Each structure stands twice: as C-alpha cells, then as structure tokens.
Amino acid sequence: AVMASNIDAFRTLRNRPHVVILGAGASVAAIPCGDKYGRKISVMDGFIDNLGMRDILAGSNFKSENLEDIYSELSKHQEYDEIREKLENSIRDYFSQYYLPEEPTIYDLLLLSLKEKDIVATFNWDPLLVLAYLRCREITLKLPQLLFLHGNVAVQLCLEEKRIFFQLYQGYCRQCQNQLSPCRLLYPVQQKNYNADPYIKNQWDRLKYYLSYAYIVTIFGYSAPATDIEAVNL
C-alpha cells in the first residue's frame, strides 16, 4: 500500500510542469562564439555602446551607463520623447538582426529535452529562443510552451483573432488577413507596469499559474534587478 501510494505520488509530480526562466545570460551562453554571422550578443553591461546609441543619447545629459536608469529618465520628461523613440527603435533593430548558428545551441537542446506540459519563460528580447523553437519544430511538435515576459522581437500579434505568430517581420494573419502588429517590448523603466499591455499581462498570469504547481523550477542566466518588483516577488 505504501509503495502504491509512492507510485501515485510520483505520477502526480511527473505530470506537473518543469518551468525554466531565462535571462540575458542564457542567450549569451547559447551563442558563445557569436551568431550565424559571428555577432556576439550583449548583456546590459556596455549595452549603450554595443547598440551604437552613444550618439543618440548625446542630446541628453545623463551620466549613468545603466540602460534602466537612462530609459526611466527619458520616460519622465516629454522633451526626450524623440530620443526615447530612437532608443526603442535601436533596441528592436539591434535584436532583430540575430540568427542562430548552423550547429545546435543550448536553446535547441533545452527545448528538445522538455515536454509539452513544460514552460520556458524568457525575459529576453532577442529572437534566439524563437528561432530555436522553429528549428526544433522541424523535428518534433512536442515542444514546451514559450512565455515572453518582456515581449520579443520575433513575436507578432493578430489583435483581431488574438493569435500570436513566431516571425521576425510583420506579415498578415492567415485567418483574417489583417496585418500583424509587433509584440510590444517592455522597456526597462524602474517601475514596470506589467498590466498595461494585455499580451504581457497574459504572459505573467500564465507564468504565475504554472509556478503555483510546478514540479521543478530552473533559473538560467537571470538575476532579477532590485527595481523589478514583479520579478523579485515571483
């Protein structure tokens, strides 16, 4: 009876999801030698120079090198709206240029090692996880679900059908033929409002649900900033 009880408990646990949470360090580890064209991906340290945004920010008087500090200040002052918009466009353009190398990456191996009940939630804007997912779909459809907690450059939305598409560039919905909208990127203000965007809110609500009964939680390459209260409270 005890053994049967243990087996039942094991089966119950086995059916619970493995939740994997990814940060910038995971994408760095995925392409340690650079992407398909040898481009290294940047973490937040040195981000301003790596994005070539030094000239864009020359019109402001910020001394901080921290992107979150800079973006938070830009968001507070209407006179910096043009600079902020250029910064946002630079971020989206920068991450949209990355392509996976031909050989399998950590992301490919991660996705293939998980099951359909499992979850991979990422804070990253870059398309590497999505590109790995699309590549793995050529092998199997039994892949984990993906959640994008800060949005992603490779996610397009059909607002009419409430469907998402994994692709880098805008196209048209296969159902209603309406033009797709780029997923909003949640930029690094000190007080993030995860409820302002319906898609982002949905991603966070789903993550909290899966975390509530997860069997295993793995955090890879992520260290929650003290200012990101929502992430810290997870």
Provide a role label for each language-model segment:
Residues 19-25, 121-124, 179-234:
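Glycine-rich anion-binding loop/nest that anchors nucleotide
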Residues 29-31, 129-132, 156-159, 166-168, ...:
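Short helix/loop capping segments that flank catalytic or ligand/cofactor-binding pockets
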Residues 14-16, 41, 53, 158-162, ...:
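Metal-dependent nucleotidyl/phosphoryl-transfer cores and adjacent nucleic-acid-binding surfaces
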Residues 148-199:
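Cys/His-rich short segments
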Residues 136-147:
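A short alpha->loop->secondary-structure connector
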Residues 132-138, 233-234:
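Short, aromatic/basic amphipathic alpha-helical patches
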Residues 1-129, 138, 225:
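Gly/serine-rich nucleotide phosphate-binding loop at the start of the catalytic core
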Residues 116-118, 143-144, 215:
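Short glycine-/polar-rich loops that comprise or flank the Walker A/P-loop
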